[in-house]
Curated annotation (Swiss-Prot):
The gene is CHO2. Residues 40-56, 716-732 have a biased composition (Basic and acidic residues). Pathway: Phospholipid metabolism; phosphatidylcholine biosynthesis. It is found in: Endoplasmic reticulum membrane. This is Phosphatidylethanolamine N-methyltransferase. Its main location: endoplasmic reticulum.
Amino acid sequence: MSGPASSTGFHIHAEGLHGRNVQPSKPTSDGGVAPTALGEKARVEEDERTDSEKKTFGRTPDGTIFTVPPTRDMVSQLLSPSEPKNLSDIFVLAIISCHIFLLRFLPSSSRVAAFAIIFLFWRAAYNIGIGWLLHMQSNGRTLVCWAKKSNIFVNPSTGQNPHPVLYNLLKWELETKIPEQYSFEDAPTEYNTWLVFRRVVDLILMCDFTSYCLFAIACGGRPAGEGFIMLALRWITGMSLVLFNLWVKLDAHRVVKDFAWYWGDFFYLIDQDLTFDGVFEMAPHPMYSVGYAGYYGISLMAASYKLLFISILAHAAQFAFLVLVENPHIEKTYNAPPPRKRVAVDTDNVKPQDDDVSQDSSVINDNVYSGQAVATLEPSSMHNLLGPHNIDLYRITDSSVLLIQILFSALAILTPSTPVYQFFFVLNAALWRVWYSVGIGYILNRQSHCKMWTRHFVKYGESNQEAWQQWKGTYHLSMTMTYASFIAATWKMYSFPQDWGYGLVLLRHILGASLIALQIWTSASIYESLGEFGWFFGDFFFDQSPKLTYSGIYRYLNNPERVLGLAGVWGAVLITSTKSVIFLALLSHTLTIAFIQLVERPHMQKLYGQSLRRDAGLVRSLKRSLPPSLKQFHGSVDKILDDSIEFIEEFIEAARPKLAAGVKTFVKDTSALFQKYPARITISRLEPDLAGYDQKDYSISLEGTQSSEPAQFERASGKEGEKARSMPDRRGDKKNLMFEYGAPIKVKWTAPLNHSKKDWIGLYMVTDNTSREITRISSQGRWIGTNKASFDSLTCEQGLISSDIVINKFREDGEPKDVASGEMVFSGDKLWWTQGVFEFRYHHNGKHSVMAVSRPFEIRIGRFDDDAIYGDRYGLVRAAIESALLPVVQNCFDRDPEIAPQTVEEQYGSLVDRNGKYSRRVVFAVHQMFGIEFAPEVVRADGNVRNLAWRICNAKKVLAPYSMSRTNGATTPTAEHEG
């Protein structure tokens, strides 16, 4: 991997919610509040305040600006005698006391099981309960909707609050806790909701921590036969981890304050810049990574495997909480895609590519927005290698690697573990490691100095792109064989323990597996930061070096592969405890460090010069904590290392003529797609009482963009009888409803004046429901409520235009009647992104009782007919493809001006690269229109409609011999072609 994070893209590193920079607010893509400056009002107030009266300003989604009062941390509020106590504090302390009394009075035989269940309950309340609440709040602002619907924060004197006792209790509770700069009546609903949510979080977090400590006490003991030295080591190490954990929590709270500690930005945003130092420079997501070191310290002091396993389970649950709840919200709130740069394009000067455009054109830079520049370059390939989802057995790289791995695994499993076989497997692993570091290092060193690898392919008329692809295959094969041979050698040297409870056997396996998992995570983080370009040392092959960025794991470490990237080999050492594996681990680590110092580092210095960072975040944090004498010692050690490395480089340079050799290898790589099949939940709910509602008063009518003419005429395919080939006679004035793929559909509805405010309309496939009276399948999010503020989510209101407009209409029996009417638009994620026949269903009172069903309508993508284009000119065909493709791409991108292009040259919005659903929609449409199947990565790589049209034209040319259409391939000669 090529040094620090090298990438053509711009990266914003998003920390965990408990540790992220609260940046100035900007608008988000969904129209909600996002971090940007909070307006002139905040600035004026800020100018007027003195340094001693600094205030923090918050902003709600509707734009309300308010002063955020200072709050105290949870532990101080609960345990400090100087802090005023209210009813909720007493309740939390009482629950904690019950836990302690339970430990005291439970019989010793049942304490462990009881407190294991209690701790798992509170951990589930944290990760599942709080996680669900935050997920719903992030996506639909559910908690705020609950508060507004119940009117619990509205003054009872207005007559709108049906819960005056609850109102007074909350007012007393919150104003007692926040005596300064806070008024319960004047605070926004979002802020009050957050304060109530905080009290729930306080209860769960305190009980979670208390039950864990009590569970540790119940499990604690001293192993039989343990000596004093081991006892002292256990307790010293355990206490050190606990103290480190305590420092992490305190330092994290010092940086992020209560706002981020209690997930405040799920409710509102603040105008404040936080300085990230200390623990946030040491590790990613420190609250969830190193912030759980105390769990393992307590497990070590308790000497209990039960406690250790539950600690690992709780830690894993916390990471799941981070991935499923916090990270999506962080990405949506703080890492919204930047506005698209639009460049005026002189279309008169943009010439279409010729039919025989060179296959060796340069790769398009993703950051180039000039339509003219992009239009004249051939789109690049996006056939990635790494990852199980990229395995493609049609590629010789992937198929060869897979076959070799199968053969290698068979040899390792089927051969006996005799000393002779063990020797050959260890020797094989050592040779592959030497090749991976020395051989690959030599190639990269020569490539850096004289472009040796590229020159070889140019000599035979190949391009730089071909050299790059061949190199990727060589490196990928070498890497997979290196680790496969190491795993095989480890397997040969490993023997299953006869007694897992003997000594440290089980602990060694747990620590070894943890180190292996750490290496896998490190490799995934490196790949996420570098991409394929950096992973395969792309800056050794392309002079137009990308911008140097430090994102992801490189924010904390300059060379993570130096230590963490080899944690797995030392995990294997712990598991096997054999000298041979120790030798392989030492060899691997030594050669890796030599590779970094002798190959990567000189090239990075030559390429990036002074822009290279000397110290990473972790090193800076450690240096700040060192005394001056140790800092001087560190500097002298660095000088010695630099002098030694310089001597080795000079020695190798002098000996190079004697070591000359050619290096050749095979080509192999990985890519295939695993598809997820969404499960459907069938829900049957029948409204018990529909009396008083006449279904004749309900109706649904549709408006949408009619599909293209080719789609209308495709029903007559020539396979029918003669009568069926003509257009059908339609009786009545209603035309067939056939809408464009992905186009918004407007739904107009009517209902009785007294209809339920919780009525809703859903979109379904016609074949999904056999009953017209009740819907028996979930809408999977494709529904909209007929009235605002009727459901506990704002998502169901997206697309709602109007509600309860009284109109006079004639019913089917001819009787005029006043009814309520409304309009809504289904678009984006509320549509089906496939072809078929669909219908809308009007449902009663939040249930699944059907009151009205719309006319069935069809979504169809018309086939592109290039036979209709006069002649066989490439330019005409491509122009026609561009014209047909542009509206389809716009529909696939939800017609969002920040994403969808307005012209064929305009670049797609950056959100297309982040969310794969957009590119998957496009490749489906292209497959249906042109019969050509692309991978979603191709759409992202092309970047605009013109490049995609070029790729379609090129694919049609390549596949022309297999087509029987006149323009696409050879056909049977006709009389006019003969003679």
